[in-house]
Amino acid sequence: MRHRMKRNKLNRYGSHRRSLMRNLAKEIIEHGTIMTTTVKAKVGKEYIEKLITKAVKAYKIKDENKEESIALRRQLFAELGDRKLVNKLVDEIAPKYTGRNGGYTRVIKVGQRRGDGAEVSVLQIVE
């Protein structure tokens, strides 16, 4: 039975999968859009949406509850490992989505990769 088997393992062990998701998140925060396989894009979308949700919460409460805002920034830093990206996520990307509940990213299927025929998609942050 496949109960509670929601996530795709991507044929990788746990630490490799976490590293892959972290790298996808770093690239999309830095560049705004990335091209990858469709399966990686769909799994990465879930991961990135959670990070952006934390960033939006940190942005909304930065004036009222300083401690909680700092705690959320530290959680983002633990996931990303780069202060510049955390600052960009909270200060530049999060303000665009304060009135939005989810749906911060989109996956657009592009076609097949020429070398191996893998289905390729573009993962981008919605403007």
UniProtKB/Swiss-Prot annotation:
Signal sequence annotation: none
Family: Belongs to the bacterial ribosomal protein bL17 family.
Organism: Fervidobacterium nodosum (strain ATCC 35602 / DSM 5306 / Rt17-B1)
GO biological process, one term: translation
Keywords: Ribonucleoprotein, Ribosomal protein
Subunit structure: Part of the 50S ribosomal subunit. Contacts protein L32.
Pfam family, one: Ribosomal_L17
UniProt keyword Cell wall biogenesis/degradation present: no
Alphabetized Gene3D superfamilies for the sequence: Ribosomal protein L17
Keyword Ribonucleoprotein belongs to the record: yes
Protein known as: Large ribosomal subunit protein bL17
Gene Ontology CC terms: cytosolic large ribosomal subunit
One term of GO molecular function: structural constituent of ribosome
Biological classification of the source: Bacteria, Thermotogati, Thermotogota, Thermotogae, Thermotogales
